[in-house]
Amino acid sequence: MSDLQGRKVFKVFNQDFIVDERYNVTKELGQGAYGIVCAATNVHTGEGVAIKKVTNVFSKKILAKRALREIKLLQHFRGHRNITCLYDMDIPRPDNFNETYLYEELMECDLAAIIRSGQPLTDAHFQSFIYQILCGLKYIHSANVLHRDLKPGNLLVNADCELKICDFGLARGFSIDPEENAGYMTEYVATRWYRAPEIMLSFQSYTKAIDVWSVGCILAELLGGRPFFKGRDYVDQLNQILHYLGTPNEETLSRIGSPRAQEYVRNLPFMPKIPFQRLFPNANPDALDLLDRMLAFDPASRISVEEALEHPYLHIWHDASDEPTCPTTFDFHFEVVDDVQEMRKMIYDEVVRFRNLVRQQSQAQAAAAAQQQQQQIAQQTNVPIPDHQQGGWKQEEPKPQEVHAAGGHVNDLESSLQRGMDVQ
């Protein structure tokens, strides 16, 4: 193992998992199409981290682009309290490598597991979760970035209800110019249940409102204890949205970019909107008002993140001075790169640069800590470290999977809705 100097090998989900020698793997957390995740502990400090092994990075161009995007965005958003923190990265075998390791903040579970567990949640929990999602989203949007895959499974939570947004692999840039936005919906495969209707219906442009729709779906899921628009396929997804929200007005219908989808909606019988109070009779009226504004069918009528933060439902949490924006916008120019080998070099360079950065920071922090320790010794102080209880939810269920379309139900329309803005 001379080629793995300074590292150790563990078996995680029957795969070699190569970690920095400072860490011991303690628990398998999950596996999916993009890799495997485990919990690990720093043997010197006792600090826990989540280590994600991103596998088969260069087997497909789309996977390489997704990995590069995730790495860049996690660095750009590093430091916001409601976005998962990237601690370190590693490429143990850099020669023609096909996997990358990301060391991230360790959280206890995701919001999907909490909802599925049936653990009793109060209105105060709902307010806290939605507020934190919006704070993170405000920061993301201010960098001209759309997350595009907000769902309970991508919201990490601790026992103290601290929430952090993760998984930026599907994120895209946002421009005020609609022409620039129109081309960005290629390969858009976000979870169907949280996908805004304007994506399926191929509106001529898209906005930050697509993420607000997803937050509305999450709020409805919290209120009801289950996914709100749980379509079996894309046609059923659209039908469920129309069933609850009612038939769109003519101005909205005219902006549906897919002729097939527009014809389908126009040929449906008129449907009135079902009041959310009837669907969630025990909910806080302010929660239902916010939900109504988030789940506006027309994106132009949907509430913005900034407006949502000022909504009465969140007044107990809202503090404009403590809801920062990102100091710099994110540069998506790397998206034009199509050569896999060039992306391989870009990922390697990102990892090396970040590793050097965090190690320089760590050395500076260690020096400062040593100086502080010397001062404490000189003052003969002895402050005990508190013993925090490691409580919380223990669910180990897999994250919700997409429900595949059942059969050839309105095949042409289904294909049109699935591809969204690719259909022009």
Swiss-Prot record:
UniProt keyword Magnesium present: yes
Upregulating conditions: Expression is induced by cell wall-disturbing compounds.
GO cellular component entries: cytoplasm; nucleus
Swiss-Prot/TrEMBL keywords: ATP-binding, Kinase, Magnesium, Nucleotide-binding, Phosphoprotein, Serine/threonine-protein kinase, Transferase
Annotated stretches, region: Disordered: 375-424
Disruption phenotype: Results in severe sensitivity against cell wall-disturbing compounds congo red or calcofluor white, and drastic alterations of the fungal morphology. Leads to reduced conidiation during asexual differentiation. Abolishes the production of fumiquinazoline C.
Family statement drawn from the similarity comment of this UniProt entry: Belongs to the protein kinase superfamily. Ser/Thr protein kinase family.
Name by which UniProt lists this protein: Mitogen-activated protein kinase mpkA
Species: Aspergillus fumigatus (strain ATCC MYA-4609 / CBS 101355 / FGSC A1100 / Af293)
Encoding gene, per UniProt annotation: mpkA
